[in-house]
C-alpha cells in the first residue's frame, strides 16, 4: 500500500500535521501506514480527522469493527435524546455523519470490504439519520403544537419515503437524498393550547427535518435533501395525506414517477403498521397487471433528455450519465421491472444487483449480458464512491487534473491513469451495447419509412390518393378493395377514445405496419386481418407501443396474420399473446415435448393456489401461448404435421394434469380425501384419452375425448369435516374437472371435453370404477366401442390404475373375434357415419368423412387390430395409426407397400387439415386433389373388409 511520488508531498504534509496534533501516538503502525496512503488520496478524510479530536482518538477502535450499521440508530437516538434545541441537535447529526463517513471512506480506500458492504453502510447511515432526526423533531413538534390525530383520536405518524438509491439500499458516498413525506389521515393535533390541522403540523415537521439535515453549519451538513420528486414537484404541498397521494398517482401520475417509485422505501418502515397500507396503495401505480411496453418509450425519452443535458454541460466523462454509464444500467433493469413487474414478483425488488439476478433467472437477457452489466455496475459504483470520497463532493465526472487522476487511479488499484480510463471505456461500451439493443439509442439515425407508406396513412381520408398509391406505387391488384379497408379502418378509429398518446403511437406505427404488410406477396390477406386486430387493441396503447417499439414483433405479427386467420383472430381476441412475438427465436421454438408439464408448473407457481379465477386464467393463457408457438413453427415449416400433433397432445396432457391437481385441491378442501388413499401414493384416479388425444393426433381445434376411472372400493368415505361417500367424491372431482375445462373466462375456455365414450355413454356413470369398466368392455361394449379403445390410452393416472387399464385394454383388443361379423359391424358403422357426416358438398372432397378419406383409414387400422391381435398381441401396443401400420408390417399382417400408401394418405390429409385449420377453412378440397391416394385407400378397404356397402 504505497503512493506514487507525485502524491507523496500531500501525504507527507498531512502526516506532519497529524504528528503535531499528537493523536498518531496512540495509533498502531498498520493504521498509520494506511492513513499515510489515504492522505495522498482523500482531502475529506484528512481534514475531518484533523478537525475532530474525538474522532482521531477513537478511530483505531472504530476501524477494528467489521461493521457498524447495526448500531447506527440506537447510538444516534441516544445522542439526540440529550439535545433540547436545534443547535445542539444539528451539531450531533453532523459530527455523527462525518465520523461514520470517515469509517466508510477508510474501508473503501483500503479495499477492506466489498462494494455491497460499502453501499449498505452508506444507505443504513442515511436511513438512521433521517429516521432518528424525524423521531427527535416529532417529539419537539408535539410538545409545541400537540400530537396529530385522526378522527378516532389515534396518533398519526409522518412516513418518509426514500427514493432512488436511498430507497434501493445503494446510496453513493456524497449523494443527495430524494424524499417524499406523507401521513395516513387528516385530522387535528391534540394536547396543546391550540390545535392545528395535521397537514399544517406535518408541513412544519417536514421543514424542520429538511433544515436539520440540509442546512450548512460550522460542522458542515448531513445531506442535500431533494423534495422535487413529490407530487406536483416544487409547486406541490410538502406533505400529503394517503388519500391525496393516491388520487394524484391514479389520476396524474406520469411515467417518470413510476420509474422513480420502483425503489421507493419507507424509512424505518418496521416501526409503522401504516406502512403496509401505503405499500399496497402505491404498488398498482408502479407495477401494472398487464405487460406494460409503454415503459420503453418513456425511459427512452428520459434518456434523451439526460443525453441532451450531458452534451449541454459538457459532461463527456460522466460515469453516471454518459453513454454506458450507471444510469443506463439502471434503465435496463427498470425497463424489465416496469414492463413485467406486475406479472413477475421477482422483478419488484429495489436493489439493482438483485434485479439483474432476477432478469438472468427469468432469461430476459442473455447470461453474458447480465454478467457484463453486473461487472460494469460494481466497477463504476466503486469508482464513483472513491471519486466522491476524495473530497466529499457529489460528482460523477472523471477529473481533468492530472494529480486527481493519479489519485483516483491509485485508489482503484492502478499505477497509471490511462489503464483505468481504458477499463472504464470497455465497461461502458459493453453496457451501452446492451442498452441500445434493448431500449434503443436516440442518437441512431433511423432511415425514414418510404414516403408512400406515410401518405397511405396520412391520406386515408382520400380514396383516390390511397388507390393510386396502392395501384401505382405498390402494384397491388386489389387496390380498390384495400383502399376501402384502410379508409374504413381509419374512420372507425376516429370514433374510439384513443387519447393523445395512443394517437401519437398509432401515427408512428401505421407507416411501419404498411411497410411490413406490403412487403408480402399475399398482402391482400394480411391487410384486413392485421387491421381487424389493430381495431380490437387500438384503445390499449401499451400494445400499440409494443408493435411500434419492436420491429421484430411487427414483422412476426404481419407474417403470422397473413399466413393464418386463425392466429390473427387468436391475437385479436387475446392481445396478451403479442408479448410472444418479441423474440422470434422463442416464438418459432416450441417447448420441448418432455418440458410442458414443468413449464406449466412454473407458470402456475406465480399464482396463489387458492386464487381459483387466476389459476383458471393462467391455464388458458399458457395454452394460448404454447398453441401460438406451435402454430408459428408449423407455418415456418419447423414442425412436420406429426410433430405438430405431438406438441398439441403433450400440451393437452400437461394441462389435464394441472386441471386434475387444481380440481382435487378444491374438492379435497371441502370434503377431505377418500380414506383408501391413506397408505398409498396417488389419487386413485385416472383420465383415459380417446380419439385424437389418445392417438397423439390432436389438431388446433380438437376436443378432448376422455373417460374418467377410479379404484375406490364401496363403503369408503372421505376424511374431511364434511364427509361424503368416496365414489361421490370422485364424481364431484370429475364435475369440477369439466367445470375448469369448460368455463368461459376472460381468456376463453380451455378445451371442449367430451365424456360420451364412457361405459353406457351419456347415461353411464361420469366416473367409472375400473372393475366396472373391465366388466363393461368384456360383456356389454359394442364393436364401435372396442374400435374406440384401440385409440385409447392413459393420459393421467396412478401407476396402479395405468397398469390395470393397460391390462384391460390388451385383453379386450386381443379377444378372438369372428372375422365376418367384425367386418360387417365395422363396415356398417362406417356407412352410418358417412351417411350422417359425409358427402355434404357434392363438388368437394371432405377429407375426413368421404370415401377414401381419413376416417376410412382409421377404421381400417382399428379393424385390423381387432381382427389380428388374438394371434398378434403386439398389435395392441400403439394407439396412433402410423405406428399401428408400422406394426402391421412388422407382424406380417400387411404388405409394406400398402401400409406405406395408407400412412402417406393419412399424414398427407392430416397435414392438409392442419393447414386449412390455420386458414380457418373447412376440411374439404377440390375433387381432383389426392385422387391416387384416395383410390389406394378405397382399394385397401375393399380388400380387407369386403363389404357390399362400400
Swiss-Prot record:
InterPro entries: GlnE, GlnE_rpt_dom, NT_sf, PII_UdlTrfase/GS_AdlTrfase. Pfam families: GlnD_UR_UTase, GlnE. Residues 1-443 are annotated as: Adenylyl removase. It is an enzyme of class 2 (transferase). It catalyses: [glutamine synthetase]-O(4)-(5'-adenylyl)-L-tyrosine + phosphate = [glutamine synthetase]-L-tyrosine + ADP; [glutamine synthetase]-L-tyrosine + ATP = [glutamine synthetase]-O(4)-(5'-adenylyl)-L-tyrosine + diphosphate. One of its GO terms (molecular function) is ATP binding. CDD domains: NT_GlnE_GlnD_like. Keywords: ATP-binding, Magnesium, Multifunctional enzyme, Nucleotide-binding, Nucleotidyltransferase, Transferase. One of its GO terms (biological process) is regulation of glutamine family amino acid metabolic process. Residues 450-950 are annotated as: Adenylyl transferase. GO terms for cellular component: cytosol. Its cofactor is Mg(2+). Its EC number is 2.7.7.89, 2.7.7.42. It comes from the Bacteria. The keyword Plastid does not apply. Belongs to the GlnE family. Involved in the regulation of glutamine synthetase GlnA, a key enzyme in the process to assimilate ammonia. When cellular nitrogen levels are high, the C-terminal adenylyl transferase (AT) inactivates GlnA by covalent transfer of an adenylyl group from ATP to specific tyrosine residue of GlnA, thus reducing its activity. Conversely, when nitrogen levels are low, the N-terminal adenylyl removase (AR) activates GlnA by removing the adenylyl group by phosphorolysis, increasing its activity. NCBIfam families: PRK11072.1 (NF008292). HAMAP family: GlnE (MF_00802). This is Bifunctional glutamine synthetase adenylyltransferase/adenylyl-removing enzyme. It comes from Vibrio vulnificus (strain YJ016).
